[in-house]
Amino acid sequence: MQTSLNRALNGLRVSRETVEKLEHFASLFQKWARSINLVAPSTLDDLWRRHILDSIQLFQLSPAPKTWVDLGSGGGFPGVITAICLSETESGWVHLVESNNKKAAFLRVALRETAARGTVHPIRIEEAPAEIPTCDAISARALSDLSQLLEYCAPWMTVEASRTIAFFHKGRDYQLEIDKAVSRFQFDLVKHASVVEPDSVVLEVANLSRRTK
């Protein structure tokens, strides 16, 4: 187990205490996944690399602890993993937005049992800005295409003087999504190569605004 874990972490800087919390989360996840569809069943055998490592890389792209909003948190990737990683810091908090009650119940258990820094909001994404009016960072994974993700993020990112940044995991067709999104929005974009899949990226978006006709 330890050898495969070290291989999965691939040299990322993670403390022993955080690794123990991640191991406990993985155990909880496998248990709950037997009765709730948290991720594609075909990926369960590669949980550490496909899901946990993929989430850790996002947290490590952020230079400082932040108040995060994780949209469509589902099985906890990347929201719970980010909240666990924030346990190493003295600040920062993750708001996990998940409207599915069964998944929200799992997320609450995962946060509680790993002493992670987060809160679950069992609401629709469109309702989240009213409940969480400000944030420093937004994340989403396997949720929607880039144009729709930017629509979700607009209430936080298009307000005057907003410094909110967003991180989105994207697969091989990410450039097509970017080309579509730029017809509706202007934004600064950084493409981070994925440490998990060679043809995938993490898109970092900042300075979002709507295009005027």
Swiss-Prot record:
Function: Specifically methylates the N7 position of guanine in position 527 of 16S rRNA.
Broad class of the protein's primary localization: cytoplasm
InterPro entries on file: rRNA_ssu_MeTfrase_G (IPR003682), SAM-dependent_MTases_sf (IPR029063)
Keyword rRNA processing applies: yes
Residue positions binding S-adenosyl-L-methionine: G72, F77, I125, E126, R141
GO cellular component annotations of the record: cytosol
Protein name stated in the entry: Ribosomal RNA small subunit methyltransferase G
Species of the source: Sinorhizobium medicae (strain WSM419) (Ensifer medicae)
Organismal lineage: Bacteria, Pseudomonadati, Pseudomonadota, Alphaproteobacteria, Hyphomicrobiales
HAMAP family per record: 16SrRNA_methyltr_G
Catalyzed reactions per annotation: guanosine(527) in 16S rRNA + S-adenosyl-L-methionine = N(7)-methylguanosine(527) in 16S rRNA + S-adenosyl-L-homocysteine
